[in-house]
Amino acid sequence: MIVHLIDGTYELFRHFYGLRRGNPDEDPPDGAVKGVLQTVGHMVRTGATHIGVATDHVIESFRNDLYPGYKTGEGIEPALWAQFHPLEKALAEMGFVVWPMVELEADDALASAAHLAAADPRVEKVCIWTPDKDLSQCVVGDRVVQVDRKSGKIRNADGVREKFGVGPELIPDYLALVGDSSDGYPGVPKIGAKTAARLLNKHGPIESFPDDVLGEHRADALLFKKLATLRTDAPLFKNVDELKWTEPK
């Protein structure tokens, strides 16, 4: 059994702006929704059987209480935002399992679902369909992998190390050091990708760094790590069989 976990928020953005590139003068009111439905439907037609889709029902989450600069819904175009809830409804009507997240984020749902699915010995592989670097922390060997639909790459644990210079278990630390502009936190000044990887490979997680490595920025780095660490405890399902797609009657 292969479990497919889809970042519905990313897919909606992808199709919305993909349509705009083709027709910049018009935003079809349900164009992105139709695009996502076609994408997920194609997965079923090509053999996918167990599918879950995570969406951000609201953009804000518990992380906004931890850090005031964390991403919000500000700046999301009304024409795009208007398609979030219709997408959730349409996917459910098509027979797909949908997780519309409120207190947690869609990324937390994907991480939790991957954790739950991987615990079932019947599951051969878990594919997380998103290019979001946050989700690289969920990769486990060749069994839980990240699929970047944009590039077509399937990233296993070795692929994560090749891309970031550290293993999946250190991705939250890596992001804490280099920052993540899409999520709204800056990282530690003067630490780029290569320096972050070097420090993490030398010392291990941020908690193990000697005090003088980060100095006055240590507390911020630990906070950013908390922001970057995905939750894996969302009670999304009890049995992976619940993810099996069934054609609506």
Please identify what each model-predicted range represents.
Residues 47-52, 122, 151-249:
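Non-catalytic nucleic-acid-binding/docking modules located in mid-to-C-terminal regions
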